[in-house]
Amino acid sequence: MKEVIDTVGRRKTSVARVFMSPGKGKIVVNKLPVEEYFKDEFKRSQALKPLVTAEKQDEFDIKVNVKGGGLTGQSGAVCLAIARALVEFDESIRPTLRTERLLTRDPRMVERKKYGKKKARKSFQFSKR
């Protein structure tokens, strides 16, 4: 059994690298406590959802390096990375996380802007007369 599990999670343009080791439940994101980094309760709960689902909140110390994108993308990336680390630690958790869709990379990306339009789909104002 490896002492430190190293996994990567991605969401939108964010990339999270998680280093998970057995411990007392200390979670650090970019050298800040998780409560300070993800101040919004929803984003924090989304990032830590795999631990709650697997009921392993106090069993691991987790160090996260996350870069790129905004807080929503970053919390999604952290979520996927933690889920992958849990599966690497204990394969029996996989079905539980799979049913909660925590092991699936969200493929949705920002749609590119098209020429002749204001944004990806929004057109300029059209006047018939």
Swiss-Prot record:
GO process terms (BP): translation
Molecular function terms from GO: RNA binding; structural constituent of ribosome
Classification via InterPro entries: Ribosomal_Su5_D2-typ_SF, Ribosomal_uS9, Ribosomal_uS9_bac/plastid, Ribosomal_uS9_CS, Ribsml_uS5_D2-typ_fold_subgr
Pfam families (alphabetical): Ribosomal_S9
Keyword Ribosomal protein: yes
GO cellular component: cytoplasm; small ribosomal subunit
Keyword terms: Ribonucleoprotein, Ribosomal protein
Basic residues bias locations: 114-129
SUPFAM superfamilies linked to this entry: Ribosomal protein S5 domain 2-like
PANTHER family named in the record: RIBOSOMAL PROTEIN S9, SMALL RIBOSOMAL SUBUNIT PROTEIN US9M
Annotated family: Belongs to the universal ribosomal protein uS9 family.
Protein name stated in the entry: Small ribosomal subunit protein uS9
Organism in which the protein naturally occurs: Chlorobaculum parvum (strain DSM 263 / NCIMB 8327) (Chlorobium vibrioforme subsp. thiosulfatophilum)
